[in-house]
Structures are given as structure tokens and as C-alpha cells.
Regions:
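Short S/T/G/P-rich N-terminal loop/turn motif that feeds into the first structured element of a domain
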Residues: 1-39, 45-57, 62-64, 68-81
């Protein structure tokens, strides 16, 4: 499944400069930060929303408020192949 994560970032250098340790079966094909780094959207391919939530919230700590949802693949356009 594809999962969207939306980020409101208080420390862009730390957030976007960090490295995620992706668990087996999870991919991150798209990262789209705003010009100033204070907002961003990522597309993950993973087994569940909770896997992505635990990964991002665990890595970001208090420097980002995050939202997550599963993409409705039947109505989506342009998902990574």
C-alpha cells in the first residue's frame, strides 16, 4: 500500500538532513519539501499506515507534527511504478 505523510517542521535542517532507517518492505519513492523546508509531503510504500507512523514519529521526535493516511490507489494518479 502507499501511505502519505504530511509534515509541519520546526527544524528543517535537522528534519530533512536526517536519514531514515527503513524497515524491510518499506520504500520511500517520493520526498517533497517546501522551498523553506517548513512543510513537506512524502509517499511511502509499506505494509501499513502504522508502520510509517512509527517510523516517522520515532525519527522526527518533537521537530515535526505529522499526519498520515493510506492512498486510495483506485483513484490516485501518478503513483510510482
Amino acid at each position: 500500500m502507499y501511505v502519505i505523510s504530511i509534515h509541519s517542521v520546526s527544524n528543517p535542517d535537522a528534519f530533512w538532513g536526517g536519514q531514515l532507517d527503513l524497515p524491510e518492505g518499506t520504500e520511500l519513492p517520493l520526498v517533497a519539501p517546501s522551498a523553506d523546508g517548513s512543510r513537506g509531503v512524502c509517499v511511502f510504500k509499506s505494509d501499513s499506515v502504522n508502520t510509517v507512523r512509527n517510523l516517522v514519529d520515532g525519527a522526527a521526535g518533537t521537530i515535526s507534527r505529522n499526519e498520515f493516511y493510506a492512498i486510495n490507489e483506485g483513484n490516485a494518479l501518478g503513483l510510482p511504478a
